[in-house]
């Protein structure tokens, strides 16, 4: 019985591949020379082994580096989260131990100057911290999760920050502008012995829950915190890389916009200092002259006709805004005068009308229509003494008072623009002669301030004017409707009146004049 074919082939291959061991004097090198295919196989095996070891080593190193990077990113995220929570905690401590407790200890106006915007900021910061705390925790969990990145829910710290940045910039910017005045108010309180002692008690209680030591240190925290956001975001951006942070591209945008917002806050403070300096340079006599004459228009025309005007940067848009400011101020004054005149003439008209009808009802007392004329007299009396007074009160509250406040708001912009015109004239002359003075160093910043702030102020002034005109139109409509409702019923009764028995107005007036002359003449003896 023969062996199966597979065993036969294996036996043949073994015999053909075997070398005589007894007579073998070959070394390993000789064997490899005889079988070059072995050399290739062994070299490939060594290469694969070496590459496997190298790849394992590289994978281990990259894993260690990735974990180290993740640890650094998580550390930054935790710092952001914990520092934001601590900051909001300090804001609430300041609210409890200072704002709430001082509300009945200091003047209401001073308390409002110090804490009004601070409390608004505290509310916004609390809402922001709640959302940011959750987003930062989600980002940390996203980094620690070993799932595939495409399967993970992607949080977005940068997107959340960008959505909040406009609101934060607005409230923090307002607070930054008045922060210096807040410090002066607190300094004034410290000079009052009773308030100072009470503040020390507040300090002692606040120190139990916070590391801040007095009210000043609490009130400066918002500005410090807002300026720290770019540092935290940049630190996170530098330590992160694409793929680790879910919104790495948006994170770069958040860094850029937060830096712009911080620069904007610093610029607002510098602008405020420039504006205060400009207002301080305007004396009371100059202000009265400025607000009561067309001196600004004359100065604008003189500056526009100057040959040196081209040396003033951005002079055309600024002069256009200044001209609009002056004309808006004049129009608002004229509007207030026109409304006051209309109220005066309305009161005068109905008072005279009532006086005439009352006198005429006396002349008609012996006629059938006497009672009806008496009703009209009463109705006109109600209009003259009731409806007109209500009209005046409504106009005073809803129209004239807002217009007067708007006119007062024009004071500072008009004074600042007057200072700018003077500096522009001096700047153009010094520019041509290449001689500069120290008081002109702030001129470019003042120009930038007018370029940005005047359009906003003019828009606000237009809105106030529109609201006042609409309110006045509604008050007028209500007044005329009241007159119609009061007069229509009594006047309608005259449609059925027989006027034949009513004496003519000429005969009545003649009789009255004759009687008056007889009473005034001396009696004969």
UniProtKB/Swiss-Prot annotation:
One annotated Gene Ontology cellular component of this protein: cytosol
Cross-referenced PROSITE patterns: DH_2
SUPFAM superfamilies: BAR/IMD domain-like, DBL homology domain (DH-domain)
A biological process from GO: regulation of protein localization to cell division site involved in cell separation after cytokinesis
Pfam families (UniProt xref): RhoGEF
Keyword tRNA processing included in the entry's annotation: no
UniProt KW keywords: Cell cycle, Cell division, Cytoplasm, Guanine-nucleotide releasing factor, Septation
Major subcellular site: cytoplasm
Transmembrane segments: none
GO MF term set: guanyl-nucleotide exchange factor activity
CDD domains with a match to the protein in the record: RhoGEF
Domain of life: Eukaryota
Protein's job: Has a role in the control of cell polarity and cytokinesis. Involved in bipolar growth and septum formation.
Official protein name in the record: Rho guanine nucleotide exchange factor gef3
């Amino acid at each position: 019985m023969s062996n199966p074919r597979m065993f036969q082939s294996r036996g043949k291959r073994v015999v053909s591949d075997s070398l005589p061991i007894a007579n073998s004097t070959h070394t390993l090198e000789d064997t490899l020379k005889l079988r070059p295919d072995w050399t290739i196989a062994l070299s490939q095996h060594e290469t694969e082994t070496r590459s496997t070891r190298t790849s394992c080593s590289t994978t281990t190193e990259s894993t260690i580096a990735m974990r180290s990077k993740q640890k650094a990113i998580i550390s930054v995220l935790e710092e952001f989260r914990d520092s934001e929570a601590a900051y909001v905690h300090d804001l609430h401590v300041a609210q409890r131990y200072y704002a709430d407790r001082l509300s009945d200890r200091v003047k209401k106006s001073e308390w409002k100057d110090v804490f009004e915007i601070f409390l608004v900021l505290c509310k916004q910061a609390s809402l922001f911290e709640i959302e940011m705390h959750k987003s930062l925790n989600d980002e940390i969990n996203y980094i620690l999760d070993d799932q595939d990145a495409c399967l993970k829910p992607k949080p977005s710290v940068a997107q959340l920050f960008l959505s909040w940045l406009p609101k934060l910039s607005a409230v923090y910017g307002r607070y930054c502008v008045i922060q210096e005045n807040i410090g002066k108010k607190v300094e004034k309180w410290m000079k009052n012995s009773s308030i100072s002692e009470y503040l020390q008690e507040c300090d002692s209680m606040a120190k139990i829950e916070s590391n801040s030591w007095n009210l000043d240190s609490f009130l400066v925290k918002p500005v410090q915190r807002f300026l720290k956001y770019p540092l935290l975001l940049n630190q996170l951006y530098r330590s992160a890389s694409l793929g680790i942070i879910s919104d790495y591209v948006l994170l770069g945008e958040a860094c850029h916009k937060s830096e712009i917002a911080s620069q904007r806050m610093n610029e607002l403070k510098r602008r405020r200092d420039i504006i205060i300096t400009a207002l301080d340079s305007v004396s009371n006599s100059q202000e009265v002259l400025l607000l009561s004459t067309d001196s600004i228009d004359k100065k604008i025309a003189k500056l526009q006709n100057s040959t040196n005007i081209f040396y003033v940067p951005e002079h055309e848009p600024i002069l256009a805004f200044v001209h609009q400011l002056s004309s808006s101020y004049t129009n608002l004054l004229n509007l207030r005068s026109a409304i006051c005149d209309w109220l005066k003439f309305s009161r005068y008209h109905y008072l005279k009308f009532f006086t005439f009808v009352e006198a005429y009802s006396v002349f008609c007392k012996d006629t059938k229509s006497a009672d009806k004329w008496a009703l009209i007299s009463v109705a006109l009396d109600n209009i003259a003494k009731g409806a007109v007074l209500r009209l005046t009160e409504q106009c005073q509250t809803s129209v004239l008072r807002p217009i007067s406040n708007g006119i007062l708001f024009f004071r500072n912009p008009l004074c600042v623009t007057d200072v700018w015109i003077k500096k522009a004239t001096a700047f153009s002359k010094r520019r041509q002669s290449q001689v500069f003075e120290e008081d002109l160093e702030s001129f470019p910043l003042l120009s930038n301030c007018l370029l940005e702030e005047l359009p906003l102020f003019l828009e606000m002034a237009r809105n106030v004017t529109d609201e006042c005109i609409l309110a006045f139109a509604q008050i007028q409509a209500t007044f005329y409707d009241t007159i119609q409702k009061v007069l229509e019923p009594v006047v309608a009764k005259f449609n059925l009146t027989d006027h034949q028995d009513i004496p003519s107005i000429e005969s009545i007036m003649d009789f009255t004049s004759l009687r008056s002359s007889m009473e005034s003449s001396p009696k004969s003896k």
